């Protein structure tokens, strides 16, 4: 705490003494400014004692500690902006917090961020981390009729997909409304985040509830097949037109970006700017210049989100997302700059898998396609665009979701699949 200046008020020093994690000099100074900013606001409203009580007792039964909501919902400290509840939860509880997606308000919080009131609660003990739900094992009967070979997957890559815009046209198949920020909310680095007018389908919806085993299966030997979280939650391949470029990126971090810059890639960034291609044409070159900050991918609580950080839209083809909204499986959704879309949900997939087991080997194998997500930068494809297939777009990526794919492999093996490996490339 050596960086604290001599005139730092005692209350600020005490509150900083409770912060979590180790920070470097610059970060420590920023934390001090964030606490000073909050102390100044709370002095005016007489809530300072309640803040100190909440931080020192770590008690969820303390009162809401509120500050006025700004127009865009963010709080500026020095030259950085962020959502206030995320800033103070990170400072006093979870230094590894990446995003507001990872937080859920406690029931007794009257001014929770998602309530969209004029005041927002920043009591760190009025929020909890979103936990990844435990997926129930799939009960799999061993079939006696084994297919001689894998059935052909429904392949939409060469068909002309329908198009939809985000958030227009997003009508869920149930009345479940998730806790999401209102339109216009911005993420911490200055991009509009989670305009999610895309309520996800309730896991209890009739369309997604796992069916009980049919009577024909009652006397069969049922084996539970469990979901295991892999070390790398997804693998990302980059393409220019129909040619794959560079090595596959394996994502291990819950939040990572794919961008157009030339920095060396690391566990949290896949930088496309450094990748070379002798066959690259002028259209691809031009598109690459507009990728910019690209897309941020989150894997939190068993859900995958894509947030467009670029100044140009991204275009996403996610069969899981399309099923949620009742669209054709090949529909391509345009995500404008700053918007955020849930592109995969493990619980929905688990329910579909449990249903498909009752329908036989082929129905389960068809779910392989659902574990692949395609995403193009700047230029879209589909019926409303000049480019009608993803391989006609200058720059695009393909995500393989490793956890669901490996789960499918295990289920198919238990069902008595052929000895060859079933995967997204089988």
From Swiss-Prot:
Domain MH1: 10-136
Statement: the UniProt record of this protein carries the keyword DNA damage: no
Single Gene Ontology MF annotation: RNA polymerase II cis-regulatory region sequence-specific DNA binding
Listed GO biological process terms: activin receptor signaling pathway; anatomical structure morphogenesis; cell differentiation; positive regulation of transcription by RNA polymerase II; SMAD protein signal transduction; transforming growth factor beta receptor signaling pathway
Name of the molecule in the record: Mothers against decapentaplegic homolog 3
Family under the similarity heading: Belongs to the dwarfin/SMAD family.
PTMs per UniProt: Phosphorylated on serine by TGF-beta and activin type 1 receptor kinases.
Keywords noted in UniProt: Cytoplasm, DNA-binding, Metal-binding, Nucleus, Phosphoprotein, Transcription, Transcription regulation, Zinc
Domain remark from Swiss-Prot or TrEMBL: The MH2 domain is sufficient to carry protein nuclear export.
Residues binding Zn(2+), per UniProt: 64, 109, 121, 126
Function field: Transcriptional modulator activated by TGF-beta (transforming growth factor) and activin type 1 receptor kinase. SMAD3 is a receptor-regulated SMAD (R-SMAD).
Biased composition (Polar residues): 167-177
Subunit note: Interacts with SARA (SMAD anchor for receptor activation); form trimers with another SMAD3 and the co-SMAD SMAD4.
Phosphoserine, modified sites: 424, 426
SUPFAM superfamilies membership: SMAD MH1 domain (SSF56366), SMAD/FHA domain (SSF49879)
Domain MH2 residues, every copy: 233-426
Gene Ontology cellular component list: cytoplasm; heteromeric SMAD protein complex; nucleus; SMAD protein complex; transcription regulator complex
Biological classification of the source: Eukaryota, Metazoa, Chordata, Craniata, Vertebrata
UniProt region (Disordered), positions on chain: 167-207
Top-level taxon: Eukaryota
Subcellular location: Cytoplasm; Nucleus
């Amino acid at each position: 705490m050596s960086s604290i200046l001599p005139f730092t008020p005692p209350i600020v020093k005490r509150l900083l003494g409770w912060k979590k994690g180790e920070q470097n000099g610059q970060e420590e100074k920023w934390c001090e400014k964030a606490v000073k900013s909050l102390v100044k606001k709370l002095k005016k409203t007489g809530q300072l004692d309640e803040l100190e009580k909440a931080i020192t007792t770590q008690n969820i039964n303390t009162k809401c500690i509120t500050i006025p909501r700004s127009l865009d919902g963010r709080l500026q400290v020095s030259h950085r902006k962020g959502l206030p509840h995320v800033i103070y939860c990170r400072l006093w509880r979870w230094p590894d917090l990446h995003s507001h997606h990872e937080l859920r308000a406690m029931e007794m919080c009257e001014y929770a961020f998602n309530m969209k009131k004029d005041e927002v609660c920043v009591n760190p003990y009025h929020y909890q981390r979103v936990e990844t739900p435990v997926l129930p094992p799939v009960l799999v009967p061993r079939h006696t009729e084994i297919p001689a070979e894998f059935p052909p997957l429904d392949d939409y890559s060469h068909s002309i997909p329908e198009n939809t815009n985000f958030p227009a046209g997003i009508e869920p198949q149930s009345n479940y409304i998730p806790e999401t920020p209102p339109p216009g909310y911005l993420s911490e680095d200055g991009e509009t985040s989670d305009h999610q007018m895309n309520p996800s389908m309730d896991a209890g919806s009739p369309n997604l509830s796992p069916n009980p085993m049919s009577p024909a299966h009652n006397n069969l030997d049922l084996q539970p097949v469990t979901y295991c979280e892999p070390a790398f939650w997804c693998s990302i391949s980059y393409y220019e037109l129909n040619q794959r470029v560079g090595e596959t990126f394996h994502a291990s971090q819950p939040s990572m970006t794919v961008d157009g810059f030339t920095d060396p890639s690391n566990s949290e960034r896949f930088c496309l700017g450094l990748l070379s291609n002798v066959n690259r044409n002028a259209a691809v070159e031009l598109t690459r210049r507009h990728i910019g900050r690209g897309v941020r991918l989150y894997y939190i609580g068993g859900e995958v989100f894509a947030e467009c950080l670029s100044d140009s839209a991204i275009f996403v083809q996610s069969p899981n997302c399309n099923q949620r909204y009742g669209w054709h499986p090949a529909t391509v959704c345009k995500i404008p700059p700053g918007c955020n879309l849930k592109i995969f949900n493990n619980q929905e997939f688990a329910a579909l898998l449990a249903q498909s087991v009752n329908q036989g080997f082929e129905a389960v194998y068809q779910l392989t396609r659902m574990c692949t997500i395609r995403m193009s930068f700047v230029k879209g494809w589909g019926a409303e665009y000049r480019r009608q297939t993803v391989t006609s777009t200058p720059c695009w990526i393909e995500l393989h979701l490793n956890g669901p794919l490996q789960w499918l492999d295990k289920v198919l093996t238990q069902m008595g699949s052929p000895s060859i490996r079933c995967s997204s490339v089988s």
